[in-house]
């Protein structure tokens, strides 16, 4: 019984051990398989990450190479630009050097010619001196002989005869002296006249400047005739808004492919032309857009005035100059006198004055400076309404310009005597530039003055902000300040302006006065979620 139980227990234990071993083996197989699967998955992920890393590195390398190529291209382009700029500057300097050498050669020839002429004059004077000595010796000898003869045959003392002879000689010498003075005065006048003609001829021959008559119109090309309708706008709103803000007339014919802008004020016309070009190129033409573009163009053109003046100063090699004067030089580009552009005229005067002063032994640089500034007051006449001479003197004194410049401003209109060679050169150059046939047109200047006078009449009334003379003086458009003028005052101002025009106008016709009062209010709405 006991042995049987032991046997059964052993069988159970063996069976349990076998089951446990079998279970262990099975579990080992299962975990091994799972481990292999995890290892394979991890290996695949590692390979994927490695592939992604390689792809990222390759992409970055390609991007860096592309960036490097781009930078290399930019560097090469910049290098080419700098090289082209350097070559241009080098060519310009060589050109200047050649001009300078030619000028030096001309000066040497001129000085050599002058030296030869002086040598001839010296020889002539030496010969005349010798002749005079001989004549004097002969005269003394004849005087002594005559005195001896007279003493022998006349009842006069030696002193009396000597006195008579001296008196006669004195009268003869006085007559000869007068004749010589008249002869030398005539020769000096003829010589100075020839010399002045030669100087002016050489100065004008060495000067070659651009020249163009200023007109009162600008023409704007259109892509097609349909753009005329877009410029006019619905019910004419666009063209009215453009005229109101610019003060410039627009003329066109149906079917035309261009617009004509007309105004006596060059700056106003240039701003309007640039504004219209931008609007046509952009395609969006509406009142708000017109006003926005117009104000932007005005700001940009006012910024360019200083750089324009700086270019003139560098071109003429004038040295340092105050910014206020440079800005006024830039403004002169948009001023005209008798149809002649004020800046172009002043540049001509500066160059000619420099050449003339150089021939006369004056300061070429100072003469150029006085020439470019002699009409500087014309840049302020439209705003301040005074004569350009007093305005030019005032602004030049404020900027501490040389007294020669002040004298040139006064003297070129006869307000002062000419005090220097440089001033005389400026006056002569001004007469040459203005007096050239076709350089000036009197009718254009009279028309511009008539238009400006109409605007000045309106601007003289209190509350008037802007005034534009339009339609060749047949219409005066006046814009008043809304914060100073009430609606019921607008008709009164219009009648007063019309009456003032009637009293002061010196020509026949009618002028329509249109007074505009406009109020604008602007605020900002804040949107919250």
Curated annotation (Swiss-Prot):
CDD domains: HDc, KH-I_RNaseY
GO cellular-component term (any): plasma membrane
Main localization category: membrane
Enzyme Commission no: 3.1.-.-
UniProt GO BP: mRNA catabolic process
Known role: Endoribonuclease that initiates mRNA decay.
HAMAP family referenced in this protein's UniProt entry, alphabetically: RNase_Y
Family per similarity comment: Belongs to the RNase Y family.
Protein name as it appears in the record: Ribonuclease Y
Species of provenance: Helicobacter acinonychis (strain Sheeba)
């Amino acid at each position: 019984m006991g042995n049987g139980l032991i046997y059964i227990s052993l069988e159970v234990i063996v069976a349990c051990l076998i089951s446990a071993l079998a279970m262990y083996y099975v579990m080992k197989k299962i975990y091994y398989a799972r481990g292999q699967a995890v290892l394979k998955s991890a290996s695949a992920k590692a390979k994927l990450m490695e592939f992604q890393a390689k792809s990222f590195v390759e992409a970055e390398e390609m991007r860096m190479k592309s960036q490097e190529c781009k930078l290399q291209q930019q560097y090469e382009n910049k290098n080419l630009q700098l090289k082209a700029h350097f070559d241009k500057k080098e060519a310009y300097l060589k050109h200047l050097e050649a001009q300078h050498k030619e000028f030096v050669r001309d000066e040497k020839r001129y000085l050599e010619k002058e030296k030869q002429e002086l040598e001839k004059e010296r020889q002539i004077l030496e010969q005349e001196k010798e002749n005079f000595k001989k004549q004097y010796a002969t005269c003394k000898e004849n005087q002594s002989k005559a005195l001896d003869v007279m003493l022998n045959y006349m009842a006069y003392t030696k002193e009396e005869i000597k006195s008579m002879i001296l008196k006669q000689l004195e009268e003869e010498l006085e007559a000869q002296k007068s004749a010589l003075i008249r002869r030398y005065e005539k020769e000096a006048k003829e010589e100075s006249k020839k010399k002045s003609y030669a100087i002016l001829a050489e100065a004008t021959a060495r000067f070659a400047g651009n020249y163009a008559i200023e007109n009162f119109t600008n023409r704007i090309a259109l892509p097609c005739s349909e753009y005329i309708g877009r410029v006019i706008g619905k019910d004419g709103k666009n063209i009215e808004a453009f005229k109101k803000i610019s003060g410039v007339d627009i003329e066109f014919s149906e079917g035309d492919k261009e617009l004509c802008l007309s105004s006596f004020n060059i700056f106003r016309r240039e701003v309007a032309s640039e504004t219209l070009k931008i609007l046509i190129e952009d395609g969006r033409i509406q009142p708000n857009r017109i006003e926005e573009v117009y104000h932007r163009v005005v700001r940009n053109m006012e910024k360019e005035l200083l750089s324009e003046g700086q270019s003139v100063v560098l071109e003429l090699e004038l040295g340092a100059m105050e910014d206020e004067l440079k800005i006024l030089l830039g403004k002169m580009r948009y001023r005209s006198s008798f149809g002649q552009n004020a800046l172009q005229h002043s540049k001509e005067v500066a160059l000619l004055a420099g050449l003339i002063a150089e021939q006369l032994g004056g300061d070429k640089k100072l003469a150029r400076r006085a020439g470019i500034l002699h009409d500087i007051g014309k840049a302020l006449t439209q705003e301040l309404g005074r004569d350009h001479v007093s305005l030019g003197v005032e602004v030049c004194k404020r900027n501490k310009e040389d007294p020669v410049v002040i004298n040139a401003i006064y003297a070129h209109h006869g307000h002062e005597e000419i005090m220097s060679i440089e001033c005389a050169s400026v006056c002569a150059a001004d007469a040459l530039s203005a007096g050239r046939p076709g350089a000036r047109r009197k009718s254009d200047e009279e028309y511009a003055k008539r238009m400006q006078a109409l605007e000045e009449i309106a601007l003289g009334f209190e509350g008037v902000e802007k005034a534009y003379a339009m339609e060749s003086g047949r219409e005066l458009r006046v814009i008043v300040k809304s914060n100073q003028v009430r609606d019921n005052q607008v008709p009164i101002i219009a009648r007063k302006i019309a009456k003032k025009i009637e009293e002061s106008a010196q020509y026949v016709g009618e002028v329509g006065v249109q007074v505009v009062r406009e109020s604008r209010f602007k605020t900002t709405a804040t949107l919250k979620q």
